[in-house]
């Protein structure tokens, strides 16, 4: 039975990095991700579960988001969503088998969101059931993935209304969830959108940003793993942009730490299930105080 022509998860992402060795160490020792190096000189992979990979790390002259890969259920949904994008005036390119195989999927199309973020839509990812996830450091549990995808991202947008329209077309639901008073008397608004049970998979606001990617959130099943990750950041004197705290929207206990590429990683635990009813907040439940400024999140959240 054909399902709705809509995105169902953030399946994979690509990042460009200047220092691949630093990223290998960071991914394994700080976060507990598995590094998979198959001998390709320009890239390696990060695993979180049975998928061949969830993150592709490209060796580059830049440190930023390379692309986001959004999954649809199958070929009928892939074709229908592609037609929806064309009918709405968006430019897409359906890739050949060579490009699809490079991403290790059965079907692939490429486009851009209104903020210029490279956006890929795919179906049929490679799942390696004979190769279980082997964390880069001991974990008490695992990462929350499955039908919730790999995590969530906040990306740069210059036109929030256009971004909301684009992601709504892809099947996302959501709107403004934070209205944060600023010292200058203005109010920062952040929009959060979901496509599955994860509270949100994409978020954005009309804020200036040096990079496409502000942060990536990865969720642990066990609080012990979040605590150890936080301890490792402190022990290794890695910048913590926002201290431990609990968000009002997704109820997750998280902190925000710097990656070797200068954008933020948000390790978390116990995220809430998405709701369809719209509501907004003016701050967090507790914590998330600014510790290391300059990472694009210098706002008072509690």
UniProtKB/Swiss-Prot annotation:
SUPFAM superfamilies: Glyoxalase/Bleomycin resistance protein/Dihydroxybiphenyl dioxygenase (SSF54593). One of its GO terms (biological process) is naphthalene catabolic process. Inhibited by bathophenanthroline sulfonate, o-phenanthroline, 8-hydroxyquinoline, 2,2'-dipyridyl and p-chlormercuribenzoate. Also inhibited by Hg(2+), Cu(2+), Co(2+) and Fe(3+) ions. Its EC number is 1.13.11.56. Its cofactor is Fe(2+). Residues 9-124, 149-270 form the VOC domain. Fe cation binds at residues 152, 215, 266. One of its GO terms (molecular function) is 1,2-dihydroxynaphthalene dioxygenase activity. It catalyses: naphthalene-1,2-diol + O2 = 2-hydroxychromene-2-carboxylate + H(+). Keywords: Aromatic hydrocarbons catabolism, Dioxygenase, Iron, Metal-binding, Oxidoreductase, Plasmid, Repeat. Gene3D superfamilies: 2,3-Dihydroxybiphenyl 1,2-Dioxygenase, domain 1 (3.10.180.10). It is an enzyme of class 1 (oxidoreductase). Pathway: Aromatic compound metabolism; naphthalene degradation. Optimum pH is 6.5. Substrate binds at residues 152, 199-200, 215, 256. The keyword Oxidoreductase applies. InterPro entries: Glyas_Bleomycin-R_OHBP_Dase (IPR029068), Glyas_Fos-R_dOase_dom (IPR004360), VOC (IPR037523), Xdiol_ring_cleave_dOase_1/2 (IPR000486). Involved in the naphthalene catabolic pathway. Catalyzes the meta-cleavage of 1,2-dihydroxynaphthalene (1,2-DHN) to yield 2-hydroxychromene-2-carboxylic acid. Can also cleave 3-methylcatechol and 4-methylcatechol. Belongs to the extradiol ring-cleavage dioxygenase family. This is 1,2-dihydroxynaphthalene dioxygenase.
């Amino acid at each position: 039975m054909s399902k709705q022509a809509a995105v169902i998860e953030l399946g994979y992402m690509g990042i460009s990095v200047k220092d691949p060795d630093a990223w290998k160490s960071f991914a394994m020792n700080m976060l507990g991700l598995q590094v998979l190096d198959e001998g390709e000189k320009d890239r390696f992979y990060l695993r979180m579960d049975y998928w061949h990979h969830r993150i592709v790390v490209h060796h580059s002259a830049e440190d930023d988001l390379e692309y986001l890969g959004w999954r649809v259920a199958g070929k009928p949904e892939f074709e229908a969503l592609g037609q929806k994008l064309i009918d709405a005036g968006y430019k897409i390119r359906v890739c050949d088998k060579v490009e699809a195989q490079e991403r290790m999927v059965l079907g692939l199309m490429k486009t851009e969101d209104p903020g210029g973020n490279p956006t890929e839509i795919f179906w049929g990812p490679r799942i390696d059931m004979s190769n279980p996830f082997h964390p880069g450091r001991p974990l008490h549990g695992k990462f929350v993935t499955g039908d919730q995808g790999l995590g969530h991202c906040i990306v740069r947008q210059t036109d929030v209304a256009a971004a909301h329209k684009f992601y709504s077309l892809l099947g996302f639901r959501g709107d403004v969830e934070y209205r944060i008073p600023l010292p200058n008397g203005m109010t920062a608004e952040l929009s959060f959108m979901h496509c599955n049970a994860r509270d949100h998979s994409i978020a954005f606001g009309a804020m200036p940003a040096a990079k496409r990617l502000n942060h990536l959130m990865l969720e642990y099943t066990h609080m012990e793993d979040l605590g150890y990750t936080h301890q490792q950041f402190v022990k290794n004197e890695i910048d913590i942009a926002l201290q431990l705290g609990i968000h009002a929207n997704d109820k997750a206990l998280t902190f925000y730490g710097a990656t070797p590429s200068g954008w933020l990683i948000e390790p978390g635990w116990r995220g809430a299930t998405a709701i369809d009813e719209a509501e907004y907040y003016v701050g967090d439940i507790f914590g998330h105080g600014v510790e290391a400024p300059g990472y694009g999140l210098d706002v008072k959240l509690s």
